[in-house]
């Protein structure tokens, strides 16, 4: 593999990289030898171990030239089963400070459906440089491998060829095969965590959302100096949408932190199987919405008995809305927090004024995208902790299915339409997209 440096005198100078790990030798990128009257810079390195450095020259490493990328895109908002299509476009050579990515898996989340419909506040960039009409490349979460990068002589970054990364900024387009992105928009995965691809692809959005909601409103993380988990009373959390990816992460983190959980789910033919699955993750109690609202079952009394006099429940997590959420709020102790991070029922949330007046209830919203903009360093620490828990088997990823994308653009568009129909009907596992090599 041949690389090229572009030095200040604008002379293109070849550098050769030998990738044999048994015979790696390196020389400083500023080391020169003279052949005739021309300076020649040489460096020997293995791309899989190539690290960034600061130099007065621009340096390329790995794969940096133009390639063809394939992507799932839309030209206008609308029905996800109808507006998505596949698109091929030329990905130009890297610019200064950019990183070349090969996406391994791109995750589909409920918010992505809202993005396609045009009802989500965070939107992908409208690209006018990749086709005859403006297009938006879909995908907010996924895992990618670094195939190359260009150093600009000013920035020293922390990546090397072969590193796996997740997205550190929203709507970067993870449903494509390749991308050139700024290194500042990426988060490296710790190599010593040994995560497999499915774990890595589902790590950047849902587990952090669960972590923050369990930490920021009622401090339940025992590592927090202000954690109420260290007090005399056992802490409890109640949540709806407990079978969602966020809900499952909440269950597992709460179990790890010694916090009890009461989990509400929609009734279905396989409800016993679902309850068993959530309990295997650490759920203390699982109820359907019908069971929760039933007066015949005297559920409120049962929940109070579960919590007991030695416990308290100050946190409720809501991603649904509707009547069930109001009933959840009524069960909270004094100074309770109702945190809303979704509204799948698409109905208004009505809460009795008495909860605010006499019980000092606080109702707030949470969106991870807002939090990450102001907590970059804390996010890095959190991601490492989540990666470690995942590697230790203490935080399991949701059940996933990999959908292979290949063939003509028409074939890919048809497959994506089928995937969106399945998601719309609530069938199947969490979908991960993978572009097959051609």
Residue ranges and their predicted role:
Residues 374-438:
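C-terminal hydrophobic helical "lid"/dimerization subdomain
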Residues 207, 241-248, 322:
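Glycine-rich NAD(P) Rossmann-fold beta1-alpha1 loop
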Residues 1-68:
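N-terminal mitochondrial targeting presequence
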Residues 336-339, 351-396:
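Rossmann-fold dehydrogenase core element
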Residues 332-333:
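Helix-to-beta-strand junctions that scaffold the AdoMet/dcAdoMet cofactor pocket
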Residues 255-324:
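Adenosine-nucleotide cofactor-binding segment
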Residues 128-143, 155, 164-241:
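NAD(P)H dinucleotide-binding glycine-rich loop of Rossmann-like/cofactor-binding domains
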Residues 90-107, 120-173:
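Glycine-rich beta-strand-centered segment in the early N-terminal region that forms part
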């Amino acid at each position: 593999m041949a690389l090229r440096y572009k030095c200040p005198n604008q002379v293109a100078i070849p550098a050769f990289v030998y990738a044999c790990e048994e015979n790696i030798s390196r020389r400083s990128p500023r080391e020169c030898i003279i052949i005739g009257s021309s300076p020649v810079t040489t460096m020997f390195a293995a791309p899989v171990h190539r690290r960034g450095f600061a130099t007065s020259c621009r340096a390329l490493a790995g794969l940096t030239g133009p390639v063809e990328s394939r992507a799932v895109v839309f030209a206008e908002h609308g029905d996800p089963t109808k507006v998505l299509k596949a698109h091929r476009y030329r990905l130009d050579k890297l610019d200064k400070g950019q990183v070349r990515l090969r996406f391994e898996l791109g995750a589909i989340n409920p918010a992505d459906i809202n993005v396609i419909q045009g009802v989500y506040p965070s939107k992908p960039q409208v690209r006018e440089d990749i086709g005859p009409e403006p297009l938006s490349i879909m995908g907010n979460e996924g895992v990618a491998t670094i195939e190359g990068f260009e150093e600009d002589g000013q920035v020293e970054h922390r990546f090397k060829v072969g590193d796996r990364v997740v997205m550190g900024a929203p709507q970067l387009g993870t449903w494509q095969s390749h991308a050139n992105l700024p290194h500042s928009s990426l988060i490296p995965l710790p190599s010593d965590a040994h995560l497999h691809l499915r774990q890595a692809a589902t790590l950047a959005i849902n587990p952090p959302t669960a972590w923050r909601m369990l930490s920021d409103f009622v401090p339940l993380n025992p590592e927090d100096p202000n954690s109420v988990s260290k007090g005399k009373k056992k802490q409890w959390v109640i949540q709806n949408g407990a079978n969602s990816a966020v809900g499952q992460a909440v269950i597992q983190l709460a179990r790890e932190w010694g916090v009890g959980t009461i989990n509400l789910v929609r009734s279905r033919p396989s409800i016993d199987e679902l309850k068993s699955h959530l309990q295997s993750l650490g759920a203390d109690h699982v109820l359907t919405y019908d069971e929760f609202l039933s007066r015949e079952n005297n559920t409120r009394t049962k929940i109070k008995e579960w919590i007991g006099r030695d416990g308290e429940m100050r946190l409720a997590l809501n991603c649904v809305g509707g009547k069930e959420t109001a009933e959840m709020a009524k069960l909270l102790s004094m100074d309770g927090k109702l945190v809303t991070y979704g509204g799948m029922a698409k109905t208004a949330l009505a809460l009795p004024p008495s909860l605010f007046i006499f019980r000092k209830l606080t109702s707030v919203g949470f969106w991870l995208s807002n939090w990450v903009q102001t907590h970059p360093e804390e996010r890095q620490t959190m991601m490492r902790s989540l990666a470690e828990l995942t590697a230790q088997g203490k935080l399991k990823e949701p059940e996933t299915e990999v959908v292979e994308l290949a063939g003509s653009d028409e074939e890919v568009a048809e497959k994506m339409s089928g995937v969106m129909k399945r998601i719309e009907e609530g069938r199947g596992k969490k979908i991960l997209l993978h572009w097959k090599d051609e």
